[in-house]
């Protein structure tokens, strides 16, 4: 089963003045029709603007219940990440969280495909057997995503940010965003992973994290020291 609004209309670029008029945008829905991959069905499951829709939720859960595997496409919409405003929290829309919980009850074999341009809280990540973070894919990203999901390509990306457990864990939580004219940057050198590593704050996924379909093993490592120091 393929579930999620982003499978129909991919989040492939930013919003505001960064938006461009693409000559063509590939979607998972369209790519599946020519891929030869058989699916039990494809539905949106939720409204992109965050509104609850019980009929869409029920349709998605029913589809998940009669499927072997669920590919759930979700994340942040264009209005969540745009110029001229600061995000007030790091959560995905609540209607998507609610659907994740219901889908997990219907089918334990769920794979999440995330579309987001920045860090999100992930208290629901244990519901997924695997997570693929696609960021903003560009106009031809759907084909690349299918290549990874089908095993044609081995994923090799690494996180460029630390995915924290909750916003309150960040050192800037108490004074950002600013309530006055000026924003205060008090972290000093302890920005991102430097803070979490130094303070020993647990995170969901650390900076540089990323898995592939390959298992690596190193042995008999040797270091030849010349002028360098290890």
Task: Please describe what each predicted stretch is.
Residues 1-229:
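C-terminal non-catalytic regions of proteins with extracellular/luminal or membrane-system context
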């Amino acid at each position: 089963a393929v579930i999620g609004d982003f499978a129909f209309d991919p989040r492939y670029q930013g919003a505001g003045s960064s938006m461009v008029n693409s000559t063509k945008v590939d979607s998972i829905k369209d790519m599946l029709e020519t891929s030869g991959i058989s699916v039990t069905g494809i539905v949106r499951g939720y409204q992109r603007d965050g509104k609850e829709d019980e009929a869409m939720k029920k349709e998605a859960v029913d589809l998940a219940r009669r499927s072997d595997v669920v590919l759930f496409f979700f994340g942040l919409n264009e209005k969540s990440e745009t110029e001229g405003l600061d995000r007030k929290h790091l959560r995905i829309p609540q209607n998507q969280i609610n659907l994740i919980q219901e889908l997990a009850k219907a089918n334990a074999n769920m794979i999440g495909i995330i579309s987001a341009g920045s860090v999100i809280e992930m208290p629901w990540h244990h519901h997924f057997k695997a997570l693929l973070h696609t960021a903003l894919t560009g106009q031809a990203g759907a084909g690349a995503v299918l290549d990874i999901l089908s095993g044609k390509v081995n994923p090799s990306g690494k996180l460029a940010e630390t995915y924290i457990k909750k916003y309150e864990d960040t050192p800037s939580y108490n004074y950002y965003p600013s309530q006055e004219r000026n924003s205060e940057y008090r972290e000093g050198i302890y920005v991102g992973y430097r803070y979490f590593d130094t303070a020993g704050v647990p995170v969901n996924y650390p900076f540089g994290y990323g898995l592939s379909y390959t298992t690596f093993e190193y042995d008999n490592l040797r270091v030849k020291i010349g002028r360098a120091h290890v």
